[in-house]
C-alpha cells in the first residue's frame, strides 16, 4: 500500500477513502454467501443438541440454505453489509496510509512495524465504533431462519434497525462492540500490516512488480494470518450479537459458556468459510483498491493537464 515508486503521484486521502469503500462493497457483494455460511456455522450448536445440527462444511451450509430457505437467504443482510463497508472499510483501509504517515512524520526512514501497528489500531478502533450498528443488523439478519414455522424477528434491514432500537434500546445497536473491537483491531493490524510487509518484501526484493500478481499473493497471505488470529474473537462476537436479551450477561460470560459447553474448538467454528471469505474478500478488495487508486490519480492528472 505504501510501496509506490517515486515517479507515481501519491493518491490523496479522499481517493484512498473512496477507493477503499468501493472496493470493499464490491468484495462484499461477491463473497457475501460465504459470510452468511460462516455466521450460521458459528451459531450452530448454541443451545442445541447434536441431533439438531444441520450444517456441515462450507458447501454443505450454502447448499442447505439454498434448498431449505431459498437462494435470496444467502444474501440476507447484504444492504446492512454494504452500509457497513461504506462506514467501516472506507475508514479503516482508506485512512491507514495517512495515519501511518502521521506517526512517521519527520522521519526519512520507512515506517516501522510499531508505526504500522499503531495506524491499524487507530483506524480499526474508530471504524468499529462508527460502523457497529450495521454489524449488529447484518449478523441478526444472517442468523435468523425461516424454517419450522419460526416467525423471523425482522422483515428487512431498516425494520431491524427500528425494532432493535425500540424494543431493546438504542444502545443495543452497539451490542458486541467490545468483541468486535478486539476482532477488528486484530484483523486491521494483521491484515493491513501483513499485506503491507508482504507487498514491500516482494517489490523491494524484485520478486514481483507492484502489480496485480503481487497484490493477489499479498492479499492471500494476509487473509490466512488474519483468519487464524481473529477467529476466536469473531465467533464470540457473532454469538453475543445474535443472543437474546439476558442470554449472556457479558462478553466473558459468552466466551466461558462456549468453552464449558462446546470446548475450545468452538472458538474456531466456521474457520474454513471464514478463511475462504476473508481470503477471497482480501484478493478482490486489495486488487480493486490498488487499481482504483491508480486509475483515479491518472484521471486526475489528465484533467489537470487539460486545464
Curated annotation (Swiss-Prot):
Functional summary from the UniProt entry: Mitochondrial protein responsible for thermogenic respiration, a specialized capacity of brown adipose tissue and beige fat that participates in non-shivering adaptive thermogenesis to temperature and diet variations and more generally to the regulation of energy balance. Functions as a long-chain fatty acid/LCFA and proton symporter, simultaneously transporting one LCFA and one proton through the inner mitochondrial membrane. However, LCFAs remaining associated with the transporter via their hydrophobic tails, it results in an apparent transport of protons activated by LCFAs.
Description of how the protein assembles with itself and partners: Most probably functions as a monomer. Binds one purine nucleotide per monomer. However, has also been suggested to function as a homodimer or a homotetramer. Tightly associates with cardiolipin in the mitochondrion inner membrane; may stabilize and regulate its activity.
Tissues in which the UniProt entry reports expression: Brown adipose tissue.
Domain of life: Eukaryota
GO biological process: adaptive thermogenesis; cellular response to fatty acid; cellular response to hormone stimulus; cellular response to reactive oxygen species; mitochondrial transmembrane transport; proton transmembrane transport; regulation of reactive oxygen species biosynthetic process; response to nutrient levels
Location relative to the cell: Mitochondrion inner membrane
Membrane topology, from the record: Multi-pass membrane protein
UniProt catalytic activity: H(+)(in) = H(+)(out)
Protein name, entry field: Mitochondrial brown fat uncoupling protein 1
Coiled-coil region: none
Sequence ranges on the Mitochondrial intermembrane membrane side: 1-10, 97-116, 196-212, 290-307
Residues binding fatty acid 16:0, per UniProt: 56, 269
Activity regulation behaviour: Has no constitutive proton transporter activity and has to be activated by long-chain fatty acids/LCFAs. Inhibited by purine nucleotides. Both purine nucleotides and LCFAs bind the cytosolic side of the transporter and directly compete to activate or inhibit it. Activated by noradrenaline and reactive oxygen species. Despite lacking canonical translational encoding for selenocysteine, a small pool of the protein has been observed to selectively incorporate selenocysteine at 'Cys-254'.
PANTHER family according to UniProt: MITOCHONDRIAL DICARBOXYLATE CARRIER-RELATED
Primary site of residence: mitochondrion
Mitochondrial matrix side of membrane: 33-73, 134-178, 233-266
Similarity remark: Belongs to the mitochondrial carrier (TC 2.A.29) family.
Modification(s) after translation: May undergo sulfenylation upon cold exposure. May increase the sensitivity of UCP1 thermogenic function to the activation by noradrenaline probably through structural effects. May undergo ubiquitin-mediated proteasomal degradation.
Keyword Transmembrane helix annotated: yes
Keywords: Ion channel, Ion transport, Membrane, Mitochondrion, Mitochondrion inner membrane, Oxidation, Repeat, Transmembrane, Transmembrane helix, Transport
Any Gene Ontology CC annotation: mitochondrial inner membrane
Species assigned in the record: Phodopus sungorus (Striped hairy-footed hamster)
Repeat positions for Solcar: 11-102, 111-201, 210-295
Modified residues (Cysteine sulfenic acid (-SOH)): 254
An annotated Gene Ontology molecular function: oxidative phosphorylation uncoupler activity
Transmembrane regions: 11-32, 74-96, 117-133, 179-195, 213-232, 267-289
Cross-referenced InterPro entries: Mit_carrier, Mito_Metabolite_Transporter, Mitochondrial_sb/sol_carrier, Mt_carrier_dom_sf
Amino acid at each position: 500500500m505504501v510501496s509506490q515508486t517515486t515517479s507515481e503521484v501519491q493518491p490523496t486521502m479522499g481517493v484512498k477513502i473512496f477507493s477503499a469503500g468501493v472496493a470493499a462493497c464490491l468484495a462484499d457483494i461477491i463473497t457475501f454467501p460465504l459470510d452468511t455460511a460462516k455466521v450460521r456455522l458459528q451459531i450452530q450448536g448454541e443451545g442445541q443438541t447434536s441431533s439438531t445440527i444441520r450444517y456441515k462444511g462450507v458447501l454443505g451450509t450454502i447448499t442447505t440454505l439454498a434448498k431449505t430457505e431459498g437462494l435470496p437467504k444467502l444474501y440476507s443482510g447484504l444492504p446492512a453489509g454494504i452500509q457497513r463497508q461504506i462506514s467501516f472499510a472506507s475508514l479503516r483501509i482508506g485512512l491507514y496510509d495517512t495515519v501511518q504517515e502521521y506517526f512517521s512524520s519527520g522521519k526519512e526512514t520507512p515506517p516501522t512495524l510499531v508505526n504500522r501497528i499503531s495506524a491499524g489500531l487507530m483506524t480499526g478502533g474508530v471504524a468499529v465504533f462508527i460502523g457497529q450498528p450495521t454489524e449488529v443488523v447484518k449478523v441478526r439478519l444472517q442468523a435468523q431462519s425461516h424454517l419450522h414455522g419460526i416467525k423471523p424477528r425482522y422483515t428487512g434491514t431498516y425494520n431491524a434497525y427500528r425494532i432493535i432500537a425500540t424494543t431493546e434500546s438504542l444502545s443495543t445497536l452497539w451490542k458486541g462492540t467490545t468483541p468486535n473491537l478486539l476482532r477488528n483491531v486484530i484483523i486491521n493490524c494483521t491484515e493491513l500490516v501483513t499485506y503491507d510487509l508482504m507487498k514491500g518484501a516482494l517489490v523491494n526484493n524484485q520478486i514481483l512488480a507492484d502489480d496485480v500478481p503481487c497484490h493477489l499473493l499479498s492479499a492471500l497471505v494476509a487473509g490466512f494470518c488474519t483468519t487464524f488470529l481473529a477467529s476466536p474473537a469473531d465467533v464470540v462476537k457473532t454469538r453475543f450479537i445474535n443472543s437474546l436479551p439476558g442470554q449472556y450477561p457479558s462478553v466473558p460470560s459468552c466466551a466461558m459458556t462456549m468453552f464449558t459447553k462446546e470446548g475450545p474448538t468452538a472458538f474456531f467454528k466456521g474457520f474454513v468459510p471464514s478463511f475462504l471469505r476473508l481470503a477471497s474478500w482480501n484478493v478482490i478488495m486489495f486488487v480493486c483498491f490498488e487499481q482504483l487508486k491508480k486509475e483515479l490519480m491518472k484521471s486526475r492528472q489528465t484533467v489537470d493537464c487539460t486545464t
